[in-house]
Each structure stands twice: as C-alpha cells, then as structure tokens.
Amino acid sequence: MYKRQAVDHDDAILKNWMAGIKQVTGHPDPSEYDHWDNIKLTPTTNSISVRGMTNHKIIHECWRTKRPFYYVDTGYIGNNQKRKEWHRVIRNNVQHQKLVDVPANRLVSLQQSFPELKWKGWRKDGGAILLVTPSPKPCRFYNVDRDTWVEDTIATLKKYTDREIIVRDKVERRKRVGVGHIFSQIKNDNIYALVTYQSIGAIEGIIAGVPAFTGAPTAADPVSNHDLANIENPKYSDEEEIWKWQKWLAYCQYTSGELSNGNALRILQEMELE
C-alpha cells in the first residue's frame, strides 16, 4: 500500500501538515510516523514529510533515490513578530523555484496586516552593502563553511566596489524581529544592496527596496541577482514583476490552521506550486 509518512512525531507543525493530508486524501493512516532508518527501507514511491534543514541527510538521500517528499519550514513573509505564523511547504525542494501567476487575495490580506510588505519601489541612493551570513543549518545543508564564505564574499565584493560592508549574523529570533528586523536595518543603515547565501533575508531585502544577491537557489531568484561583479549595476525588476513574485510567495506559505485543515495541500496541488 502507498504510504505517506513523517519522520518526526514530536513536531507540532509537522503534525498539522499530516492532519491536513488526511483531510484531503482520506488515506486510512496518512499520519504514520517512523524513524528514517525504517522509512528508507520502504519503496521509494512512498513519500515522506520532514521539517527543517536539520534533516539535510534525509533530503539529500531523497534526491538521490528520487523519493518524493514534502519539506516544511519557516514561511517567506509575514513573520516579523515573536511567533512564526507562516510556514512554507515545498514538494521535493527546500525553497520554491517555479514562479506561477496566482490571484492577489492572499498577498493583499497579508499587506493589510503587515503594511511593511507593500513594495514602495527601489531605494537606489543607499550607501552600504548588507552581508547576511548563513546560519549553521544551511551551512551544513550546502556544505558551506560560514567564515570562509564571508571572507571570500567580502574579497569578491572589494574587487567591484569600495562601499562599506556591514555583516549581519543570524541571532536569536526575539532579536531579529521588530526593531531588529532587516527592514529596520536597511532603513537605519542606509543599505544599498543585500548579499546572502540563501537566506530569506534576500526576500525581505527586495521587499524593502534594495537589490539582493544570492549564492544558492532561493524563492527570491525570479527577482534577485547572482553575479557579484554586477554589484554596482544590479538588476532592478519592474513593479509588475515584483507584484507577481509577491503574490506567488503569499500562495507558497500557510498558517498552522491551513496546514491542518488541508487547505495548504489543496493550494499546492491546485496551483501546481513547486
């Protein structure tokens, strides 16, 4: 029998997601949990659900064997408060890649709650470059050494610009929301551009009006830059492109309630989000 299994039975968000699968599929026991050592012995047609990059070995093994999986993690926008309200769910990847055109309703609702999500255009008169460093989890996932990446990135930037470079490390959550959020730092430090490996900070930077440069695949890719040689001549997507991208982001993330009532899975399937 085809099975849908989850690796961590103690994760509340993952439990919500698995409950939602049951709502949609009516599978007799989609909320089956097991250890990866047991799951990996099952047919690779059996899908699994995991949450967080600490499962990097499992995800890489799924890619290798072509086992389908759903990946759950922090949402892209709207989490600028103490508690994470939004969670992204991706099939067979860790961030969404395929931009599709979707309705505006979810974005409009988010912008009503979080006015800072309204894109106000590009800030082209900034001064410094904000270098957002990768945290330990993505470093392990992508086999990147944080210090080496910082040194190499700064060295590369200095070949093409003499702008000040401000390094921002990931700190505990309560210190990076509110006044500690990237939105605030971009304004207070007069940031010109943001450079990161694959942080959601790239998304936040673009929404705040500064071009972002990324080193690994991210959901910011449709409107971000990659070649640091272009740091003084970045791509500035037009308003229509930003609007389409933001609408898509809003459809790629869900509340705990949407995870558990099945709406998250329904949206993923109906909109063919990947």
Name every feature range the model reports, one short phrase each.
Residues 1-5:
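Conserved small/polar residues in nucleotide/adenosyl-binding loops
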Residues 10, 45-47, 75-78, 134-138, ...:
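Short, solvent-exposed loop/turn segments at secondary-structure junctions
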Residues 11-21, 52-57, 145-159:
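Well-ordered, non-membrane alpha-helical segments in soluble/globular domains
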Residues 26-83:
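Extended catalytic core of nucleotide-activated donor transferases of GT-like folds
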Residues 31-33, 158, 163-213, 217-218:
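Donor nucleotide-activated moiety binding/catalytic core segment of transferases
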Residues 38-41, 128, 192-193:
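Structural motif
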Residues 121-174:
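Conserved catalytic-core segment of nucleotide-activated headgroup transferases in glycan assembly
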